[in-house]
């Protein structure tokens, strides 16, 4: 059995570990985290047996003979922990975003020697739906690609205003939290084409206000009438995802953001994300428009639609059987990580993670500075 160490055993590690353990090839040997009670709870739910517990990652790596390490800490710690694991030469599963600022991105470029031994948590690129769309593109069925229109209307956006995710000093903001996934699957679909520049804009129209900083729902005089209060959310069947006021002066995060990405051959991608959409308004996917046809796909409905420009024909491909977290991508990433621990190359390398971060940081800078920002990193 392959021996796995975990650094940061939070909810994301918990969900991914379900898939990793399901392969039947891995055991958890060691865990590093600062909250033992939480670790114990998640480990019991995952069915993890005995393991050695640490609060210092370097000590764990020194003492344990590990075949792989899963890093699932908060975002601001990803870079330094990736560098630490790489220094031991151990295969790494690294949560996204791999960095939250330019300085950390530069640090990661120093360990590109570890790129193929790193699986970055980009499950969308390995879903059945994205793999099938790439096959369609490579077949030439839609002809010369003219434009990509991508979108992500997030139905669970409350977490980015009620919980710790609202702190962009920790997360890097919502381009880095959400667009990093979408930019990556777009890069995957476009093959070897390199993005060269980005312009972007964001808006904050709903989740803002003049309520005091640091406010929590329990002590708010408007908790019984606020449409985002926990009691009101439970009434409509929604589990509250935090208790911090989303109409306070310190709410943070955009409500929506859009970016235009230019690629080296002149192609441009239009991407937009929204965190106010709810319930059946959820939508995530893209339209890729070519001379001969258009291929459109939607993750929530797991459908691909191909429109023939030379006739009135339309083909719909239903992939709804591929269920699971991240539309089945987590399962495939888990299998890939096990393969990397056995010596196979990664399907979502550190280089891909850095490129996505560079695009997100360019979008963030473009928003602040109102200019096109070049992307100089190449895979």
Predicted features by range, described:
Residues 25, 68-70, 264, 296, ...:
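C-terminal helix-rich "cap/oligomerization" subdomain common to oxidoreductases
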Residues 1-48:
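N-terminal Rossmann-like dinucleotide-binding module
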Residues 30, 67-68, 147:
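Short, Asp-centered acidic motifs that coordinate Mg2+ and/or phosphate
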Residues 76, 99-162, 167-175, 180-183:
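A contiguous active-site-proximal alpha/beta segment in oxidoreductase catalytic domains
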Residues 10, 46-111:
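Beta-loop-alpha module in the N-terminal Rossmann-like domain of NAD(P)-dependent dehydrogenases
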Residues 177, 181-301, 333-344, 379:
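Contiguous beta-strand/loop segments that form the cofactor/metal-binding neighborhood of enzyme cores
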Residues 34-37, 279, 323-335, 351, ...:
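Active-site loop of classical SDR/Rossmann-like NAD(P)-dependent oxidoreductases
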């Amino acid at each position: 059995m392959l021996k796995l160490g975990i650094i940061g055993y939070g909810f994301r590690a918990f969900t991914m570990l379900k898939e990793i353990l399901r392969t039947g090839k891995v055991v958890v040997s060691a865990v590093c985290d600062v909250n033992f009670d939480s670790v114990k709870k998640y480990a019991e739910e995952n069915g993890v047996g005995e393991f050695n517990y640490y609060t210092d990652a370097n000590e764990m790596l020194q003492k344990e003979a590990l075949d792989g390490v899963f890093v699932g800490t908060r975002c601001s710690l990803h870079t330094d922990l990736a560098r630490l694991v790489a220094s031991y030469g151990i295969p790494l599963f690294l949560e996204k975003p791999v960095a939250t600022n330019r300085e950390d991105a530069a640090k990661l470029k120093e360990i590109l020697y570890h790129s193929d031994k790193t699986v970055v948590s980009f499950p969308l690129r390995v879903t059945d739906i994205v793999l099938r769309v790439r096959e369609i593109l490579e077949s030439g069925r839609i002809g010369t690609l003219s434009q990509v229109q991508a979108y992500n209307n997030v139905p669970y956006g409350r977490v980015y205003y009620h919980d710790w995710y609202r702190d962009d000093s920790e997360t890097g903001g919502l381009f880095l939290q959400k667009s990093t996934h979408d930019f990556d699957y777009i890069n995957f679909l476009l093959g070897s084409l390199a993005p060269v520049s980005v312009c972007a804009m964001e808006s904050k129209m709903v989740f803002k206000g003049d309520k005091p900083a640091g406010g929590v729902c329990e002590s708010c005089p408007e908790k019984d009438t606020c449409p985002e209060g926990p009691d009101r959310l439970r009434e409509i069947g929604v589990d509250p995802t935090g208790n911090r006021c989303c109409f306070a002066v310190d709410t943070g995060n955009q409500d929506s953001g859009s970016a235009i990405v230019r690629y080296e051959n002149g192609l441009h991608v239009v991407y937009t994300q929204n965190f106010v959409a709810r319930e059946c308004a959820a939508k995530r996917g893209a339209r890729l428009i070519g001379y001969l046809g258009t291929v459109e796909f939607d993750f929530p409905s797991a459908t691909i639609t191909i429109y023939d420009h030379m006739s009135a024909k339309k083909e719909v491909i239903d992939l709804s059987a591929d269920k699971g977290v991240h539309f089945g991508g987590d399962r495939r990433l888990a299998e890939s990580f096990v393969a990397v621990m056995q010596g196979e190359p990664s399907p979502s390398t550190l280089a891909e993670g850095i490129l996505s971060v560079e695009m997100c940081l360019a979008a963030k800078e473009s928003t602040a500075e109102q200019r096109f920002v070049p992307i100089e990193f190449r895979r």
